[in-house]
Amino acid sequence: MATANTKPFGAEMLWNLTYADPDRWAEVYAISGKPLPWWKKSGSPRLRLLDGSAEVQALVDETSDVKWANLQRTQSGAILYFRVRLEVYGVPWKRGDIQVKWAGRDDDATLQLHAKDQNVTLAFAPGQLKAVQAFVRDAFGPV
């Protein structure tokens, strides 16, 4: 599956972030904002990527492995990271462009993040609910 940078500068999309390409990271940070300083808490609890837009779902379906994911809080939003085989993919989001929905599913709780170009469903253990809610509030504002 090709994930070439075909969208306009600053457009939300799925990025292959495996390699240290400064131009690619500049575009990712143009969307989500720069990383927070090292002394600020910026990582989410561990999440499982369950579903996503067609682009994300095609990658998730490539292997039967559990797709662990995490969110990194940035100055203006967050970046979702997940791995497929040896590649690391990311979806940057800008605060204000995201709609958040919470739900329950069997033994897990789920978080759905909706944006214009990318939608994902993430699962986490119910015991992590407060930590995930705090992260989402810090990254995307009150929901």
Range-by-range predicted roles:
Residues 2-63, 97-143:
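Acidic, Ser/Thr- and proline-rich intrinsically disordered linker/docking segments
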